[in-house]
Amino acid sequence: MGLWALVAFCLLSLILVGSAEQCGGQAGGRVCPGGACCSKFGWCGNTADYCGSGCQSQCSSTGDIGQLITRSMFNDMLKHRNEGSCPGKGFYTYDAFIAAAKAFPGFGTTGDTTTRKREIAAFLAQTSHETTGGWASAPDGPYAWGYCYLREQGSPGAYCVPSAQWPCAAGRKYYGRGPIQISYNYNYGQAGKAIGVDLVNNPDLVATDAVISFKTAFWFWMTPQSPKPSCHNVITGGWTPSGADRSAGRLPGFGVITNIINGGVECGKGVVPQVQDRIGFYKRYCDILRVSYGNNLDCNNQRPFGSGLLLDTI
């Protein structure tokens, strides 16, 4: 080993000793936030040093999910999103979806091909339910009408709650917008901070800029908010249920993601139409991607998660 290499190694060793590792075996199996790679040394990042040889989790082999979901697949999944009757006509494009996904490099790139395809299917299924324009006898069935809506329908309120960190801007409303129908000032604030956009003062960017709109949905998907894990960690196997989770019936699978998103309304109540609708989208998209569904698709017998920042607000 050369002199400078030895010096660099010693300095790195001192740094590592003087600070706590962030992820992997060095941190009790913790995964990195935002889908970042966990290096063999237990640090989070998105470069080859973190995602390459020895990477412990969320190891992105490529940031381009277009290899798994082509434009034609995307258009087939969201077949009727551009119907004249859909308020979101022309907004939700494949290019915006791919561009936004690249800002979250762990999405659709974590795990084996089956896991990666399931994550894409699960994300599009859950967001399709939130934006669906379908009905039971709709052309091509109810699960071909995802991404029809852009803004919350009816006469939504301001969705403003007192917040020292994310105070509401005068005249702004924080009702549901975009793929995940993000709501409330504090969620707009957190999402905006994560993607580098002031959404507290400019919430309608979620309904006028398609890339920003998709990014808010990916932010929600990739971000754990205690006591809830992230949707990403659940679908990719990065979440291990605690004893309390198991007692509550919360086992890894698509059903827990529904619990994360709207468990207080939909879960633990037996068979409810909303849960079945989400599953219907998921199965159709898995079929298009030619991947199996996995286990535990519903949350019929799951108790909802406890209080969290995103609980039942989206």
Curated annotation (Swiss-Prot):
InterPro entries: Chitin-bd_1 (IPR001002), Chitin-binding_1_CS (IPR018371), Endochitinase-like_sf (IPR036861), Glyco_hydro_19 (IPR016283), Glyco_hydro_19_cat (IPR000726), Lysozyme-like_dom_sf (IPR023346). Residues 21-61 form the Chitin-binding type-1 domain. The lineage of its organism: Eukaryota, Viridiplantae, Streptophyta, Embryophyta, Tracheophyta. The gene is CHIT1B. Keywords: Carbohydrate metabolism, Chitin degradation, Chitin-binding, Disulfide bond, Glycosidase, Hydrolase, Plant defense, Polysaccharide degradation, Signal. The keyword Cell membrane does not apply. Disulfide bonds join 23-38, 32-44, 37-51, 55-59, 86-148, 160-168, 267-299. One of its GO terms (molecular function) is endochitinase activity. The keyword Membrane does not apply. It comes from the Eukaryota. Its EC number is 3.2.1.14. This is Basic endochitinase. Defense against chitin-containing fungal pathogens. Belongs to the glycosyl hydrolase 19 family. Chitinase class I subfamily. Pfam families: Chitin_bind_1, Glyco_hydro_19. The active site is at residue 130. GO terms for biological process: cell wall macromolecule catabolic process; chitin catabolic process; defense response to fungus; polysaccharide catabolic process. Residues 1-20 form the signal peptide. It is an enzyme of class 3 (hydrolase). It catalyses: Random endo-hydrolysis of N-acetyl-beta-D-glucosaminide (1->4)-beta-linkages in chitin and chitodextrins.
